[in-house]
């Protein structure tokens, strides 16, 4: 098996950008949030580990595709303990097709963990979900994803964002300046402590 190719500058940049991913995507075109799933369920094993939750605990899950100019750029999955979806994170249940950034980056009580990122392969359930929006020629390739935990009133909200091939294809001919992208975050105080883009999603 060949070792994975190193990340290029664009990939490292997008995997480690703080602030709102939706705001960064808006620099590339018109963003639409397409909701795929909203329901209570069991979390995946790696998600239980990240949040330190018992494996029998139900969570509230929301999965969306972030589409830019009719192209799927990001498959995103968020979850919080089911009890928190009725309390600290109850707004997640009613946000509909608005981006979660509308909640996360306007509430100064919300804290954010460091970003962690990795390549995910076909063995991971997130890869299988995301590949519904990937051309067949890319379906077996590893995808790049990042995640962080937002905390409000002591309750966690885990958000995982899987970058799709259409995003990288758009960025190849257009090297957007870093400074321009950061200006889209506005006066948000949720600057994350960044970890290596090769670090594991727990």
UniProtKB/Swiss-Prot annotation:
Its main location: cytoplasm. Keywords: Cytoplasm, Lyase, Pyruvate, Ubiquinone biosynthesis. SUPFAM superfamilies: Chorismate lyase-like (SSF64288). Substrate binds at residues 62, 100, 161. It comes from the Bacteria. One of its GO terms (cellular component) is cytosol. InterPro entries: Chorismate--pyruvate_lyase, Chorismate_lyase_/UTRA_dom_sf. The keyword Cytoplasm applies. One of its GO terms (biological process) is ubiquinone biosynthetic process. GO terms for molecular function: chorismate lyase activity. Pathway: Cofactor biosynthesis; ubiquinone biosynthesis. The keyword Cytoplasm applies. Residues 181-202 are annotated as: Disordered. It catalyses: chorismate = 4-hydroxybenzoate + pyruvate. Its EC number is 4.1.3.40. It is found in: Cytoplasm. Removes the pyruvyl group from chorismate, with concomitant aromatization of the ring, to provide 4-hydroxybenzoate (4HB) for the ubiquinone pathway. Belongs to the UbiC family. This is Probable chorismate pyruvate-lyase. It comes from Xanthomonas albilineans.
